[in-house]
Amino acid sequence: MTDYKDTLNLPQTDFPMRANLPEREPQTLARWQTLDLYRKIRKDREGQPKFILHDGPPYANGRAHLGTAFNKTLKDIVVKSKTLSGFDAPFVPGWDCHGLPIELNVEKKLGKDKLSANAFRQACRDYAFSQIELQRDDFQRLGVLGDWQHPYLTMDFGYEADTVRALAKIVANGHLLRGQKPVHWCAACGSALAEAEVEYRDKASPAVDVGFEAVDAEAVRQRFGVKNATTRVLVPIWTTTPWTLPANEAVSVHPELHYALVKSELQNQPVYLILAKDLVDSAMQRYGVDDYEVHGNLKGDALEGMQLQHPFLDRIVPIILGEHVTTEAGTGNVHTAPAHGLEDYFVAEKYNLPINNPVDARGRFIPDTFLVGGQPVFKANEPIIVLLADSGHLLHSETIQHSYPHCWRHKTPLIFRATPQWFIGMNKNGLRERALAEIEKVTWLPAWGEARIGKMVADRPDWCISRQRLWGIPIPLFIHKKSGELHPKSPALMEKVAQLIEKESVDAWFDLDPKVLLGDDADHYEKVTDVLDVWFDSGVTHFCVLEKRRELKVPADIYLEGSDQHRGWFQSSLLTSLAIRDKAPYKSVLTYGFVVDSQGRKMSKSLGNVILPADVVKNLGADVLRLWAASMDYTVEVNVSDEILKRASDAYRRIRNTARFLLSNLYDFDPKKDKVAVDQLVALDRWAIFTTQKLQEKIITAYDRYRFPAIYQAIHNFCTVEMGSFYLDIIKDRLYTSKESGLPRRSAQTALYYIAEAFVRWIAPIISFTADEIWQFMPGDREPSVFLTQWFSDFPNAALSGEEEQRWQLLLQIRDEVNKALETYRNEGKIGSALTAEVVLYADERLNAAIATLGEELRFVLITSEASVLPFNEKSKAAFDTALPGLALEINVSEFEKCARCWQRRSSVGQIKEHADLCDRCVSNAFEDGDMRQFA
């Protein structure tokens, strides 16, 4: 048999079938760096409309985890898609560099007491730099394009100085307050602790039920509908910290819980108790009472304002409403000491209750405290319990074991203690109302984000922006020693401090002799040594970065972070921006859910479900990780597992195989010389171009709306359905067997060229390494990188009429039914390949109209050796119905010989003596002028 291989146009390309991403991606990265790609993009887009995605700074501690990898990938997808849309979309990454975790790491390595404050801060700075280098490498390895050589760092001297300037504007605009707020306090350390310094251990504590007596018992009884009674009314609270009772200022109830008035006898005296209805039985059991009556039923909000007598102090306290009250334990009535608990503080703030803190920095009661003056707080429990028992206010007492916060250094129990702090006042100069109004002007994605942040801002207390730590940006203020007032020239003084910090770092403030700035007035003023909350540091990036860098602008077009940032960065940025310039720093905000495992569990070493991005990149490649990120519905929790990543890897392979098919059939195609005019295109090729053009419109719209999973799905379907199992499958015969430079093949190549030009750009924002690799193998002259182009727009006018579109849609369905039938026959051993079959289609008028025009070329669409169409009502006995109404099929095995070149079984095989093993079409294509195609 003659070998006709040399007469075929078999696919050929140097684009590798095996991706080998872990080795190949670093080569692409090196090429981008040699090319200085980011700078080239900036130069190329100069003068174009700006699009600014502002990077929320990750914390400079530890390698990138899957959450930060997901974050940076989504941002990169947005920025690259906007670049392809023609925008000038610079991306300036940043890092959050101050704060406790860095302090702790440095302290573990070097010790805090062994270093001077300045040396300790320098060690923190050095540590942060080392972590930034690690994370920068991680993010660049993911293919994220940005100004990595000039990121913003909250510890840069210039940034620290500008943060002081931002605070100065907030001071000048009248938003700064001084007040007290409870914090975790370690008596052994003599200082406040942050959450990261707190560890929870079991502790034995006294658990007591204490009765607060209603001042106007009759009015209370009447509220519950009880008349003609003289019995006293008690409101029992349950607490494990009796030592905090001297600081009690209220009793909290939940506005929506139902409360009952319970008549009983305690300590041989009749009494009415107000208890949460759901806790009546458990409370009465605790009090050892079996005989009791439940009277009335009121919601908690009906109890608001009721006056109670403090159990041992000459103090009247109100019942107030608090959402923090639960029915998990206790009585439904919560002892509220604003100086000793955050929830107590927040709820008390709404009622303007005093912050009464009788405990000093050593954890002892101040000397004039009733009964327990001078005693350590935990030793004060016993005398307080004895006093309550003697006065008849102790309803129950026991010792319980429970989880309690301890100092991570000393392993001793902590207390909550109110200390002087600096706040941004939510109700000063209408900040809260302006924030709520501005929230409505921002586009929130998903839309529920608006209600979420709106409720948080509506309910939040003043923002405590001060911390008592070493590693942070100072709050450079002077307070009058007698009046407690700020220096009247504070904003101007802060500018002078900012200029010093710009040159010498924050040490300039801590080392500063107040006389340098205040002269003789220095004796009357105290220098503040607090530092700023790190949320303030990152919250003023709109001022320190967006406003200061020439390539950026404020407001940013979008902030994109995890949904936890409604409480964090989105809010701190909004409040500082309003306090500075009375405008939100962003036009839109996009949030995503937490990255969890396939069962919805958080990543945890103890669960053994931690997946490190570095491991994924090392084993599968960054593009697989990026494809996973794009495929996930980010509006909910984002699942990841080895199995999910394997599916992403499989999907990646389909995309790569599609690209390889396109490239391998364009090896001899020069778009300048070989493109076929639209009016000469084979109908199927015109349909393919039209379909590609239509899909591109949908994909660009999806990119503009940040609907990444829809893009992933569209590209996946394009590779597997419209192209993979339909168009590309059909045109293989034409590409391989038609005359090399004949119209049928050049028509198909023209379509493939347009598809490739569009396709490589669609995938570029998502699988960037692969897209740029494909780009290097594309035919024709082009820019050195796909990211220096825009969405492909040089499509011919291949528009189809509605009728033509409908016809091709029907052909897709018909081919699907034929394929299913052929597969069944193949599985049953009735036929070999589809080319051994001849198919008769029995079609109704609607389907007949769609396929009759194809005539002889129908077999190319169905990839069978023969295909004919007959009316539906002429079905033979051998025919069978399909799932498509109006279509029946009859499949027979061809009795003709197989063509040695195209493998179709045709009656013309053997008819031409010189080429007895070829069909007439192959003789024409191999040795004559070639066949012609009109439809397929």
Swiss-Prot record:
Q: Which organism is it from?
A: Coxiella burnetii (strain CbuG_Q212)
What does this protein's record comment on cofactor binding?
Binds 1 zinc ion per subunit.
For this UniProt entry, the molecular function terms from Gene Ontology, in alphabetical order, are: aminoacyl-tRNA deacylase activity; ATP binding; isoleucine-tRNA ligase activity; tRNA binding; zinc ion binding
The record's listing under Gene3D superfamilies reads: 1.10.730.20, HUPs, Valyl/Leucyl/Isoleucyl-tRNA synthetase, editing domain
| Cofactor(s) listed | Zn(2+)
Q: What positions does the entry give for ATP binding?
A: K605
EC no. given is 6.1.1.5
**InterPro entries, sorted:** aa-tRNA-synth_Ia, Anticodon_Ile_BEm, Ile-tRNA-ligase, Ile-tRNA-ligase_type1, Ile-tRNA_ligase, M/V/L/I-tRNA-synth_anticd-bd, Rossmann-like_a/b/a_fold, tRNAsynth_Ia_anticodon-bd
Q: Which GO terms describe its biological process?
A: isoleucyl-tRNA aminoacylation
What are the entry keywords? Answer: Aminoacyl-tRNA synthetase, ATP-binding, Cytoplasm, Ligase, Metal-binding, Nucleotide-binding, Protein biosynthesis, Zinc
Keyword Nuclease among UniProt keywords: no
Instruction: Specify the protein name.
Output: Isoleucine--tRNA ligase
Residues that hold L-isoleucyl-5'-AMP according to the record: E561
Tell me the leader sequence span: none
Where mainly located?
A: cytoplasm
Tell me what reaction this enzyme catalyses.
Answer: tRNA(Ile) + L-isoleucine + ATP = L-isoleucyl-tRNA(Ile) + AMP + diphosphate
Free-text domain note: IleRS has two distinct active sites: one for aminoacylation and one for editing. The misactivated valine is translocated from the active site to the editing site, which sterically excludes the correctly activated isoleucine. The single editing site contains two valyl binding pockets, one specific for each substrate (Val-AMP or Val-tRNA(Ile)).
Which locations, inside or outside the cell, does it occupy? Cytoplasm
What function does this protein fulfil?
A: Catalyzes the attachment of isoleucine to tRNA(Ile). As IleRS can inadvertently accommodate and process structurally similar amino acids such as valine, to avoid such errors it has two additional distinct tRNA(Ile)-dependent editing activities. One activity is designated as 'pretransfer' editing and involves the hydrolysis of activated Val-AMP. The other activity is designated 'posttransfer' editing and involves deacylation of mischarged Val-tRNA(Ile).
What family does the database annotate?
Belongs to the class-I aminoacyl-tRNA synthetase family. IleS type 1 subfamily.
For this protein, the record's HAMAP family field holds: Ile_tRNA_synth_type1
Q: Which residues bind Zn(2+)?
A: C899, C902, C919, C922
'HIGH' region, short sequence motif: residues: 58-68
GO CC terms in record: cytosol
Q: How does this protein assemble? A: Monomer.
Question: Which stretch carries the motif 'KMSKS' region?
Answer: 602-606
